[in-house]
């Protein structure tokens, strides 16, 4: 199962990428982020821990990192693996489309509510990112 949200932002892809590659900037656009760590560099295969408000710390792995284009991370849950995609699509006109995708590795209809809950703050976080980049 998969949900995505995309929004056009007046920014260079390099500026948008800084909000992903620099974990200190995650606190600017992830409102419920309490703590995030990364063991190693921001590159494919690196692992870390993320803690969101009201949730226990969760381990994640960066499964794909393409600088200035996209990164994906994976978190294991009792309902199946969750993949989070963060893409920067360059419009070659001084703007980019930021697209965040959440995929739950399950086809079980009972897990749909869980996926909806995980995805629920994604649109708002992209609007916050837009405000950060366009100010």
Enumerate the language-model features and the residues they cover.
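Hydrophobic ligand-binding cavity/cleft-lining segments
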Residues: 1-37
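Well-ordered beta-strand positions in beta-sheet-rich domains
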Residues: 4-6, 57-59, 83-85, 101
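A short, structured loop/turn motif at beta-sheet edges
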Residues: 10-14, 64-68, 87-97
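Generic recognition of short, well-ordered alpha-helical interface segments
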Residues: 11, 28, 57, 120-124
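Hydrophobic pocket/interface hotspot
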Residues: 16-20, 26, 62, 71-73, ...
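Glycine-rich portal/gate segments that line the openings of hydrophobic small-molecule binding cavities
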Residues: 37-79, 83, 131-135
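Beta-strand/loop substructures that line and gate deep hydrophobic ligand-binding cavities in soluble
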Residues: 76-125, 131, 135
């Amino acid at each position: 199962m998969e949900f995505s949200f995309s929004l056009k932002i007046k920014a260079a892809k390099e500026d948008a990428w800084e909000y992903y590659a620099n974990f200190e900037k995650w606190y600017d656009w992830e409102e419920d982020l309490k703590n995030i760590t990364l063991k190693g560099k921001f590159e494919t295969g690196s692992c870390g821990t993320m803690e969101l408000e009201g949730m226990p710390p969760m381990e994640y792995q960066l499964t794909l990192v393409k600088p200035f284009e996209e990164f994906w991370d994976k978190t294991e849950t009792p309902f199946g693996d969750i993949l989070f995609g963060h893409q920067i699509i360059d419009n070659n006109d001084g703007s980019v489309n930021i697209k965040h995708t959440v995929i739950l590795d399950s086809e079980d209809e009972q897990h749909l509510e869980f996926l909806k809950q995980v995805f629920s703050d994604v649109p708002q976080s992209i609007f916050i990112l837009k405000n950060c980049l366009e100010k």
